[in-house]
């Protein structure tokens, strides 16, 4: 289990195997290489700098496999937020965990 933060520095949750989870236990996505896809197969972002989540604006129309999300897990107290990084051109911050509904 590896904790991850948005590019802006907000604690998002963790990666367990090929799955992305919010800190409050929602299964958000599957990881294909470094790209993250939601349960409908839509690109939602990628992993950069080992533990940061960011979204490439040019990839928002990309699709991969769909999947059935796992049930909710136990919630964790979120890790401390970090200072955000400067945004790269053509990217935007990964959505916060609260924006994903189950």
Model-predicted regions and their roles:
Residues 3-4, 19-21, 36-37, 53:
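Well-ordered beta-strand segments characteristic of repetitive beta-sheet solenoids
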Residues 5-7, 23, 64:
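Intrinsic disorder/low-complexity segments enriched in polar/charged and small flexible residues
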Residues 1-2, 42-102:
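Long terminal segments
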Residues 1-14:
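Short, compositionally biased leader-like segments
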């Amino acid at each position: 289990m590896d904790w991850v933060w948005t590019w802006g520095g907000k604690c998002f949750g963790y990666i367990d195997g090929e799955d992305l989870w919010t800190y409050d236990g929602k299964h958000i996505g599957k990881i294909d290489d470094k790209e993250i896809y939601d349960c409908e197969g839509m690109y939602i972002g990628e992993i950069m700098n080992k533990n940061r989540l960011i979204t490439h604006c040019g990839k928002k129309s990309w699709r991969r496999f769909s999947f059935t999300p796992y049930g909710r897990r136990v919630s964790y107290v979120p890790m401390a937020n970090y200072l955000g990084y400067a945004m790269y051109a053509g990217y935007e911050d990964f959505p916060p965990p609260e924006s994903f509904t189950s």
